Regions:
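C-terminal motif of bacterial Sec signal peptides marking the signal peptidase cleavage site
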Residues: 3-6
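Helix-rich interaction surfaces within compact, conserved domain-sized segments
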Residues: 66-125
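N-terminal secretory signal peptides
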Residues: 8-60, 122
Length: 125
């Protein structure tokens, strides 16, 4: 008696992150030097060296950090360094575990436009 089993396999974590990064990147503007920072509402891991940080419900920043940043992919929580209530590229860091990951680039994300696109996609399914 032979047993045939099949399991549905969806995209793995890296593929999901790559897809999410593509979406965030499409709605991200040009690089900026810094952004105002008072509190972090949420964050989304988008790859080994990429993440989106939400500072308000409809305000997010796409960050790229420089290696080494080995703990980011496995982080449960992160923090950001800041100076005078601003986070600056090439000066501040994403703090995760024992890593201090230098922020290489900051891009503002048009969260409202991203949400509109998602609603349109869900409406057409």
């Amino acid at each position: 008696v032979g047993v045939l089993s099949s399991c549905a396999s969806g995209p793995g974590p890296r593929e999901r992150m790559a897809t999410q990064y593509e979406r965030y990147s499409r709605f991200a503007g040009d690089a900026v030097a810094s952004f105002p920072f008072f509190t972090m509402q949420n964050w989304v891991l988008l790859g080994q060296y990429r993440l989106a940080v939400y500072t308000k419900v409809n305000e997010a920043w796409l960050l790229e950090v420089s290696p080494p940043c080995s703990d980011l992919e496995f982080a449960q929580a992160i923090a950001l360094s800041s100076s005078v209530s601003r986070v600056s590229a090439k000066f501040d860091h994403v703090l995760v575990g024992r890593d201090r990951c230098p922020i290489k680039e900051i891009r503002p994300v048009d969260v409202r436009a991203m949400k509109r696109e998602r609603k349109l996609e869900q409406g057409s399914e």
